[in-house]
Amino acid sequence: MIRRLDGGYELDDDPARIDVEAVFRFLHDESYWAKNRPRDRVEEQLAAAGRLVGLYGPDGALCGFSRTVANVQGLAYLADLFVLAPHRGRGLGVELVRETVERGPYAHLRWLVKTEDAQELYARFGFEPPEERLLERAPRPDLHASRQP
């Protein structure tokens, strides 16, 4: 799928086109949710993703990205989504969320996202605070599979 946007931008879900270095740099250096995430972990997550969507500028370079983790039985999680600073303020984040959540193979599923700063953006796509029964378990690095005997 390639979807063309105004201003020469386009969205593409071809995983071979994703600039892994650009994704790693943003997640590791700039994001609040994945700060200092190791490169091998980023690569593992990209390989295991249900869907990757790249946002590309007029020059063809990656300028935004989303990663979906999905269980086709009924749940999709919007794990990483960003638009690089020079490209913000043009509605590109809205289009990236729309492509990720409302189009593609997981559009019909229940979606979850965890965000500290984009509640209004996600509310435009029907995201609401979860029901009170939703529970979360914090990450347990001590139980990471690579550390088990």
Predicted stretch roles:
Residues E10-R17, Y32, L52, C63, ...:
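Hydrophobic/basic alpha-helical segments enriched in Actinobacteria
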Residues H87-L96:
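Conserved acetyl-CoA pyrophosphate-binding loop and the N-cap/start of the following alpha-helix
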Residues Y106-R140:
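Conserved active-site alpha-helix within GNAT-family acetyltransferase domains
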Residues V42-D59, C63-F82:
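A conserved beta-strand-loop-helix scaffold within acyl/acetyltransferase catalytic domains
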Residues M1-R37, S146-P149:
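Short amphipathic alpha-helix that is part of the acyltransferase structural core
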Residues T100-Y106:
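Alpha-helix C-terminal capping segments
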Residues D29, A48-A49, A107:
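Structured helix-beta-strand junction loops
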